[in-house]
């Protein structure tokens, strides 16, 4: 048919299309179909159910319709070139070759070559039903074939195993070698492999073969078979029960690479999956042989060896010591320096991480250059390698505080603080805390590379994650004291808006280890006068006083308990922190803050002076020293001096004049001197004599005296600067990750331990010879009323001369000439570490 012209289409009054004139004798259905083939293919949808659409206004056919076969004239069909006989012949041919088509699809290998089979596929992209069934049928065929072969292999191996066992036990090495190779070939197939591992006699024969044979080929074949068996749990158990581990360990000395590979991989599989293998390898001397193998240079082989070492050393102190005695740390560090194969570096770092918690291995790793070698990989793209290196560095860092040449590591750690990984930041902060402890060069380096800014940001971002805030605060505490850039660090904390965040850490829910670290940091920050006002405004003084009162109450409660129950518990602990440490820290921080007049007024308002006075009676000399120090600052104001005197401080202060602790005696003298400013002249004169007799003692060279004239208990208190002590168990522990049961160290807070008479200007109107001073025998100076008290006798002129004495005539001293210059800061002695701890604010 042809398209009908548009003008021939007429519209009736009922708004329906009238079909064009059609030839007679055409059914209604055919008329409808032909009507659909008009020039626009418009369809009301009534007859066909198609969606109604408006003909295109452009008069063009839709693009989608142009390629549709239905668009062609209905008269266009298959060419009528076949006769009925030909059609019948084709149908018969297709019917006769149906089985061949099925065979070609499912079993193509059964067809003879050259046979042509007519295809029923008209569209190459549309497979026939037979073709669609061919893939699963092929899979089924292969499964059946494999099952048949598996059964054949299993039967063959089962029949051959008894004979092969006899051959393996033969005395002729050639026979043994041939039998071992046959067994090795059988072990490559799964069915026969299961048959071998199910025969304990066969496995035992293989173990004997590798133990007794001197033939390399038979050894290689036998150990290769054991290697194949070790991929199955049943095979591992068979090897273990047959005593295969000692034989495999013996092969670790073989000069043949393939034998070594088979032996180490089999042992590795045993260590991973077979219970009891670790002890068996240790008893067979496997650790020593594996450490020796670390000298090889095949990275994949080394990766397996190091993983074996990690498995053996983890949780076993004896294994760690064996690795140390065999020279393991040096070889492991060499590997970290020499290779870039990620898996090898990762497995080696795991071994070092395990060894780094061993107090014996730790210094050996550090001495071998482990810190620098691990630092080389902090920029690696492998997160697991970086994490292991950081964990290991954290464990080693407390033993590396004196190591030189860590500038690159410190810079990398500061950069790592910006990571979004909590574990990475935790480790980096802990390492920085330890490496900046008692190391002025490291402190300066961290400050110069922006460490203070990074640590403040870390604390701000950490929120309530104490596993991050505690080491970060400790690191800041180290950076803000006792090095050339400490003042810059103190200012940098303020300029980076860190003061408010740090003070907030004194609030609950912070735990005592963190609070202790924050107290020390605030004390150091207070050394910068510019920080006094901001600290006060953020409530630092209020929180310090609150913590002091709580800790003081706990210590007093503990004392009462000891007195009433006879308990032997010497002090109160909270989260591993002694409350005496909190008392000393808070009082020391208030001492430095009290240098500013507004802070002194606020401290007086807190009604805390009575506690300071009571602390003068404390048996711990460091607490006596900080208490006397804060009273010395508060006594600078008349109001403070009056309150101190009203609280009865004169008596204990006078007693402390005779303390063997130079700092305590000097502060006590300074407080008494300031309290006497409005006293009568007679009182001042007696006080000056008492002070002179007390300060000019027979201890001529106390700074150079090794024991400082103190008992061993006090010298233990004046211990060196502590490294960061991690509180939480996340990550591998270091020596400093435990709080329980450690001795109480009297950390110094740098509270102006003034040399006796240093900065004490004493003038005399009468010139005279130098007078030494032995402690006077007199009693205390009078109390608030300025009354009695025996004045110490004037020492004889022949007494030894104190190095701190001035040229004076003691009998003619003008008390008004006494002037304590409390701003004078003596230099810590370089030859006395115990005494230098007074100046140690890092702990």
From Swiss-Prot:
Its main location: cytoplasm. Transmembrane segments: none annotated. GO terms for biological process: branch fusion, open tracheal system; branching morphogenesis of an epithelial tube; canonical Wnt signaling pathway; cell adhesion; cell elongation involved in imaginal disc-derived wing morphogenesis; cell fate determination; cell morphogenesis; cell-cell adhesion. The keyword Phosphoprotein applies. One of its GO terms (cellular component) is nucleus. The modification Phosphothreonine is found at residue 650. Phosphorylated on Ser, Thr and Tyr residues. Level of phosphorylation varies both during embryonic development and from embryonic tissue to tissue. Sgg is required for phosphorylation and wg signal negatively regulates arm phosphorylation. Hypophosphorylated form of arm increases in steady-state levels. Phosphorylated directly or indirectly by CkIalpha which stimulates its degradation. InterPro entries: ARM-like, ARM-type_fold, Armadillo, Beta-catenin. It is a peripheral membrane protein. Gene3D superfamilies: Leucine-rich Repeat Variant. ARM repeats lie at residues 159-200, 201-242, 243-284, 285-326, 327-368, 369-410, 411-449, 450-496, 497-538, 539-584, 585-608, 609-647, 648-689. SMART domains: ARM. It is found in: Cytoplasm; Cell membrane; Cell junction, Adherens junction. Isoform cytoplasmic accumulates at low levels in axons, at high levels in specific cells along the CNS midline and in leg and eye imaginal disks. Isoform neural accumulates in the axon tracts of the CNS. Both isoforms accumulate in the peripheral nervous system. Keywords: Cell adhesion, Cell junction, Cell membrane, Cytoplasm, Developmental protein, Membrane, Phosphoprotein, Repeat, Segmentation polarity protein, Wnt signaling pathway. Belongs to the beta-catenin family. This is Armadillo segment polarity protein. It comes from Drosophila melanogaster (Fruit fly). The lineage of its organism: Eukaryota, Metazoa, Ecdysozoa, Arthropoda, Hexapoda.
């Amino acid at each position: 048919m042809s398209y009908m012209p548009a003008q021939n289409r007429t519209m009736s009054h009922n708004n329906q299309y009238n079909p064009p004139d059609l030839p007679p004798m055409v059914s209604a259905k055919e008329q409808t179909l032909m009507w659909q083939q008009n020039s626009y293919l418009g369809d009301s949808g009534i007859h066909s159910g198609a969606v109604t659409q408006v003909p295109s206004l452009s008069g063009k056919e839709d693009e989608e319709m142009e390629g549709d076969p239905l668009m062609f004239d209905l008269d266009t069909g298959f060419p009528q070139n076949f006769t009925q006989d030909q059609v019948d012949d084709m149908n018969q041919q297709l019917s006769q070759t149906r089985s061949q088509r099925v065979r070609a699809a499912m079993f193509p290998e059964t067809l003879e070559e050259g046979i042509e089979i007519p295809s029923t596929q008209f569209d190459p992209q549309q497979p026939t039903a037979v073709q669609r069934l061919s893939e699963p049928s092929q899979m089924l065929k292969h499964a059946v074939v494999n099952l048949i072969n598996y059964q054949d292999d299993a039967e063959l191996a089962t029949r051959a195993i008894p004979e092969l066992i006899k051959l393996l036990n033969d005395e002729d090495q050639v026979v043994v070698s041939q039998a071992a190779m046959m067994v090795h070939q059988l072990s490559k197939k799964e069915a026969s492999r299961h048959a071998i591992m199910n025969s304990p006699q066969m496995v035992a024969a293989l173990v004997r073969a590798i133990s007794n044979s001197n033939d390399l080929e038979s050894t290689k074949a036998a150990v290769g078979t054991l290697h194949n068996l070790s991929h199955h749990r049943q095979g591992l158990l068979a090897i273990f029960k047959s005593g295969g581990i000692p034989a495999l360990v013996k092969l670790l000395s073989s000069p043949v690479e393939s034998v070594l590979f088979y032996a180490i991989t089999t042992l590795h599989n045993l260590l991973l999956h077979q219970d009891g293998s670790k002890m068996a390898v240790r008893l067979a001397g496997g650790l020593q042989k594996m450490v020796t193998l670390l000298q090889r240079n095949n990275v994949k082989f080394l990766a397996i060896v190091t993983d074996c070492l990690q498995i053996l050393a983890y949780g076993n102190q004896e294994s760690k010591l064996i690795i140390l005695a065999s020279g393991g740390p040096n070889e492991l560090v060499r590997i970290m320096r020499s290779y870039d194969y990620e898996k090898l570096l990762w497995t080696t770092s795991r071994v070092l991480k395990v060894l780094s918690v061993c107090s014996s291995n730790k210094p050996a790793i550090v001495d071998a250059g482990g810190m620098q070698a691990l630092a080389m990989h902090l920029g690696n793209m492998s997160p697991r390698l970086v994490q292991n290196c950081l964990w290991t560095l954290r464990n080693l860092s407390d033993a590396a505080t004196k190591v030189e040449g860590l500038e690159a590591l410190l810079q990398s750690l500061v950069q790592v603080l910006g990571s979004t990984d909590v574990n990475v930041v935790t480790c980096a902060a802990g390492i920085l805390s330890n490496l900046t402890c008692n190391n002025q060069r490291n402190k300066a380096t961290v400050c110069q590379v922006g460490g203070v800014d990074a640590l403040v940001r870390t604390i701000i971002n950490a929120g309530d994650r104490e596993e991050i805030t505690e080491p970060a605060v400790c690191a800041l505490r180290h950076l803000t004291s006792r090095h050339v850039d400490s003042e810059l660090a103190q200012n940098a904390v303020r300029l980076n808006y860190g003061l408010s965040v740090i003070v907030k850490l004194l609030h609950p829910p912070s735990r005592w280890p963190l609070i202790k670290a924050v107290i020390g940091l605030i004390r150091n920050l207070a050394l910068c006068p510019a920080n006094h006002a901001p600290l006060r405004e953020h409530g630092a003084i209020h929180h310090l006083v609150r913590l002091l009162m709580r800790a003081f109450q706990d210590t007093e409660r503990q004392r009462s308990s000891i007195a009433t129950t006879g308990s032997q518990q010497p002090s109160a602990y909270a989260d591993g922190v002694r409350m005496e440490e909190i008392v000393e820290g808070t009082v020391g921080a208030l001492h430095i803050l009290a240098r500013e007049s507004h802070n002194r007024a606020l401290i007086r308002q807190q009604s805390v002076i009575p506690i300071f006075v009571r602390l003068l009676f404390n048996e711990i000399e460091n607490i006596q020293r900080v208490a006397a120090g804060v009273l010395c600052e508060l006594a600078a104001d008349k109001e403070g001096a009056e309150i101190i005197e009203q609280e009865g401080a004169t008596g204990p202060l006078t007693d402390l004049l005779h303390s063997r602790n130079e700092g305590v005696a000097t502060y006590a003298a300074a407080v008494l001197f300031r309290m006497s400013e409005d006293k009568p002249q007679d009182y001042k004169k007696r006080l000056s004599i008492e002070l002179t007799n007390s300060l000019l003692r027979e201890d001529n060279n106390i700074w150079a005296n090794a024991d400082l004239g103190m008992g061993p208990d006090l010298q233990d208190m004046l211990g060196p600067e502590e490294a960061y002590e991690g509180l939480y168990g996340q990550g591998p522990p270091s020596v400093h990750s435990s709080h329980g049961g450690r001795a109480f160290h009297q950390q110094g807070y740098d509270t102006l331990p003034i040399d006796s008479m240093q900065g004490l200007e004493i003038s005399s109107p009468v010139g005279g010879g130098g007078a030494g001073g032995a402690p006077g025998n007199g009693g205390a100076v009078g109390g608030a009323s300025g009354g009695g008290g025996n004045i110490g006798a004037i020492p004889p002129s022949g007494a030894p001369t104190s190095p701190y004495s001035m040229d004076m005539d003691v009998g003619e001293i003008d008390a008004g000439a006494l002037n304590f210059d409390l701003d004078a800061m003596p230099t810590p002695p370089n030859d006395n570490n115990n005494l230098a701890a007074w100046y140690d604010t890092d702990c």
